[in-house]
A protein has these predicted regions:
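A solvent-exposed interaction/effector surface
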Residues: 2-187
Length: 187
């Protein structure tokens, strides 16, 4: 009985993850769980972190926008900490971004463009905790030092899985933008 339940959770998690659009990128270098990736410009819906942050974005993609248009959920959910301010973003699906992105109904959600850039990335599993984020960021910074890559800006944490995914099966990433003088973004 327990095995069937676990198998069901596993199957649901895998099928859910496989059906979600993720951003395009090109891998410039791979070293185990570390990569250097070139991302094209992306359109994101963003809100400030705080009570109800996820739900503000979820309402926006569920038709709570000026066009009352439903927008497919994508992965990952991006979290960026900037000193006292933190933000959460959803990447807008390519098809919607290529057409016309609906305007948010209020000031709580903004639609922004993340410019094309090269990022150093470390992939890890586990729960979303301050300790796990700090450990992952420390590992990425140490790896970047060995590669003589300099970071600029604040880290971006990427969470690909729904909260009911077993921690050891979660795909999480920490990303640091590679310094401008080291940017060689592929076409």
């Amino acid at each position: 009985m327990l095995c069937r339940f676990a198998a069901g959770i596993l199957a649901a998690t895998i099928s859910h993850t496989m059906a979600i659009e993720t951003p395009d990128y090109k891998v410039a270098e791979q070293d185990g769980k570390f990569e250097v990736r070139d991302y094209p410009a992306m359109t994101v819906a963003r809100t400030e972190m705080g009570d109800g942050d996820f739900m503000r974005l979820f309402r926006y993609i569920s038709g709570g926008n000026e066009a009352e248009q439903k927008i497919a959920m994508t992965a990952p959910v991006l979290v960026q900490h900037k000193g006292e301010e933190s933000g959460m973003s959803f990447v807008v699906p390519r098809e919607v971004a290529a057409a016309k992105v609906p305007a948010p109904k209020g000031a709580e959600v903004s639609v922004d463009t993340m410019p094309a850039a090269r990022f150093a990335v470390f992939t890890y599993s586990g729960r979303r905790t301050d300790k796990n984020e700090a450990d992952a960021l420390g590992r990425l910074r140490a790896w970047m030092d060995t590669k003589k890559l300099r970071a600029e800006g604040e880290p971006v944490f990427a969470y690909y899985d729904p909260p009911w995914t077993l921690p050891f099966m979660r795909r999480n990433e920490v990303m640091l933008r590679v310094a401008a003088e080291q940017q060689i973004v592929l076409p």
